[in-house]
Amino acid sequence: PSNWRVSWVNQETPALDIPAIDYVIQGDREYCRLQQELNEANERNDGHAIARIHGQLETLDAWTIQSRAASLLHGLGFNQEEIAQPVKSFSGGWRMRLNLAQALLCPSDLLLLDEPTNHLDLDAVIWLERWLVQYQGTLVLISHDRDFLDPIVTKILHIENQKLNEYTGDYSSFEVQRATKLAQQTAMYRQQQQKISHLQKYIDRFKAKATKAKQAQSRMKALERMELIAPAYVDNPFTFEFRPP
């Protein structure tokens, strides 16, 4: 829906002088917009605007934003001293944690996460898993970590043979469902191929015989009408080996 609030993880982190916690708070775009409007209203001494904006900030639970941002940073591995350090003092991996904290802080109806555990240690991964389990919006998550996916996801979207297939359940359930689907499709494909072969042999044998031409023609039409079952598609395994020194 066009009115959904979408949150995502920025891939770039500028080397800023501002404290880490202030950078994370910038992730709440609506809060920052209202703060800017409040500053302008204060400069104009516009009481009506100030009251209105305070009401909107109250709705956003703005008065707890510092503690919420600090809680996110602590969960992602920052200590109390580090959350006050400038963004530019952190390495690339830790800056990505700041970007992740930004995305989690921003109120959203749709949260997009692409390999969010890449720069996290085990404690941070466990914390993030618990946080995402209680997330109230719609989460679109890409990850190669099945142990991370299983407790969180309830649907799997699988791209296969240029088609998008939906499976209900966690990743382990998806593997079982897909294996069952492939086995069924393989069995149906083989059964149909046997039927096609049987019909084709009959056609080849009797199409030139006057006494059997009608039956052969009927089988030809049956072949033409038949909706072909595709063979089960299995991804080619990727393998390589190091060259001997």
Spell out what each predicted region is.
Residues 1-190, 242-245:
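ABC ATP-binding cassette signature C-motif
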Residues 55, 204-206, 238-240:
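Short hinge/gating elements
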Residues 108, 114, 228-229, 234:
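Generic low-polarity alpha-helical segments
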Residues 178-202, 206-233:
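Intracellular alpha-helical coupling/juxtamembrane segments of multi-pass membrane proteins
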Residues 230-245:
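Amphipathic heptad-repeat alpha-helical coiled-coil/stalk segments that mediate oligomerization
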